[in-house]
Amino acid sequence: MNEKNILERNINYSNAYGRNLLQEAIVSCENAIAVDLVNKGIDIDHQDKMGWTPLHFCAQYNNITIAELLLQEGAKVNIIDCYGNNPLWYAVFNANDDYCLVKLLVKYGADALSKNNAMRSPLDFAKQIEDTEMINILANKNLISKYQSKK
């Protein structure tokens, strides 16, 4: 049996950490492999043993290219991990003045008010670190959502 047949039969294989091939490709910064796996139909919402999805890894490693692909393919933006954190939490925490991934997640409906196991939200964290631009991105998203739900 050749390598291609093995990959096609086991595309959703997960390792000892519960990570699938897509998650490992993201961690390894192998975008071409990640794109190929998505195109082959890998589970884009697979959760590892810590509850991380491929989108969590994109947020952790600030990989906007694959995050955008996953969101366009319908990845669930608000899945929480074992700590109650959605991918937006990691994007906010790792932004370092680069707000592109945060804006992308917000555009696709990430919940900036989602409380984790410590009862803190991404917006709470932005306020704690006094990141005015981040606060504006997250707060404006929630104001728009509240306005639209009242229509």
Language-model region placement:
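Conserved ankyrin/ankyrin-like repeat signature
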Residues: 32-33, 65-66, 100-101, 133-134
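Ankyrin repeat A-helix N-terminal signature
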Residues: 24-29, 57-63, 90-98, 125-130
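Ankyrin repeat domain, specifically the short helix-to-loop turn at the C-terminus of the second helix
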Residues: 5-9, 35-43, 68-76, 103-111, ...
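Ankyrin repeat boundary signal
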Residues: 13-14, 44-47, 79-80, 112-115, ...
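Ankyrin-repeat-protein effector appendages
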Residues: 2-5, 9, 108, 117-120, ...
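Intrinsically disordered, low-complexity regulatory segments in ankyrin-centric signaling systems
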Residues: 1-28, 35, 39, 144-151
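Alpha-helical adaptor scaffolds
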Residues: 27, 49-52, 56-61, 65-76, ...
